[in-house]
Regions:
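PAPS-dependent sulfotransferase catalytic core
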Residues: 1-69, 76, 124, 211-215
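PAPS-dependent sulfotransferases, especially Golgi type II membrane carbohydrate sulfotransferases
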Residues: 1-5, 159-167, 186-187, 191-267
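Short beta-strand segments
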Residues: 7-9, 82-85, 107-109, 175-177
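PAPS/PAP-binding and catalytic site of the sulfotransferase fold
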Residues: 14-28, 96-100, 175-200
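Short catalytic/ligand-binding loop motif for oxyanion handling, primarily in non-cytosolic enzymes
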Residues: 16-19, 38-40, 90-93, 113-118, ...
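PAPS-dependent sulfotransferase catalytic domain
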Residues: 60-76, 117-195, 249-252
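Glycine-rich phosphate-binding loop used to anchor ATP phosphates in small-molecule kinases
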Residues: 69-95
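Conserved phosphate-donor/acceptor-positioning beta-strand/loop module used by diverse small-molecule
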Residues: 85-88, 96-122
Length: 267
């Protein structure tokens, strides 16, 4: 029987890199965002609506139905350990624990300003495509504001999701800092294996590759999920205006750095 674990956390923080590294292990299957979380959410809505027939669905049937979504989606994968990826899984820690009592969630994280900067850098490399990260891409201030929206923002929403999961079930979650993964990949991955309670696999950190052109084309951003060769840290040039840097730096949104589960409140 397959074991199912999860990857969530913040965007532009190494989740694709982490998946690519994990995939070197012949027992592991890890990929970027799957539709399983969305289908799970829709299924939960469907079987808990006011439809009279839903009252005949037992607790065991609900569990079997939802478990079947995972089993069916990954049925063709012959590897014994699956890592499913979604930014929303940290909002469903109680659900995941009930379905997979052993499971854990790996959550890559990074400084918020660095994430915004990374999105701006990568999107600037596709100048002939509309930026799909924000509805209003007239200027960098509007883009960052929309990316940080707590409900729909590509950065703000995952940040709130992560805080929810870490506040309710912190023992299920390992926060994997991007810089640590890049600077000390072996040390970081040994900590990951220890957290997962799996025997360590000797990875080749000089030859890590991954790409998904289909997904990236859907986002109108080339190389959004591309990993090439050696794992190393290359500090990017900051292209954000100083006003934006100061605004989000002063908010101290990186709750994992000061070990406080603070309320995230920002405009």
């Amino acid at each position: 029987m397959k074991q199912t674990y999860f990857i969530s956390g913040l965007p532009r923080s190494g989740s694709t890199l982490l998946s690519a590294i994990l995939n070197q292990n012949s027992d592991f299957h890890a990929d970027i965002a799957s539709p399983v979380e969305a289908v799970t959410r829709m299924s939960l809505d469907a079987i808990t609506s006011d439809n009279a027939s839903n009252f005949t669905v037992s607790e065991e049937q609900r569990k079997n139905l939802l478990y079947g979504l995972f089993d069916g989606y990954y049925k063709h994968i012959e590897k014994p350990v699956i890592f499913d990826s979604s930014r929303r899984w940290t909002t469903k820690t109680n659900f995941l624990r009930a379905l997979f009592p052993y499971t854990k969630i790996l959550c890559p994280v990074r400084n918020i300003v660095s994430i915004l900067n990374s999105f701006e850098i990568i999107s600037s490399k596709s100048p002939f495509y509309k930026n799909t990260l924000a509805d209003n891409d007239d200027n960098i201030f509007e883009r960052c504001k929309q990316m940080m929206d707590k409900t729909y923002g590509v950065v703000g929403c995952p940040l709130v999701n992560l805080l929810e999961g870490y506040s309710s079930n912190p023992e299920m979650i390992m926060l994997v800092e991007y810089e640590n993964l890049c600077k000390e990949p072996e040390k970081t991955m040994k900590e990951v294996y220890k957290f997962l309670e799996k025997p360590y696999y000797k990875h080749d950190f000089d030859n890590v590759k991954y790409s998904n052109e289909t997904f990236d084309n859907a986002c109108n951003i080339k190389n959004l999920h591309t990993v090439k060769n050696k794992v190393e840290y290359n500090p990017p040039k900051c292209i954000l205006p100083q006003e934006i840097v100061e605004k989000y730096s002063e908010m101290n949104l990186e709750f994992w750095k000061n070990n406080t589960q603070k309320k995230i409140a920002y405009a």
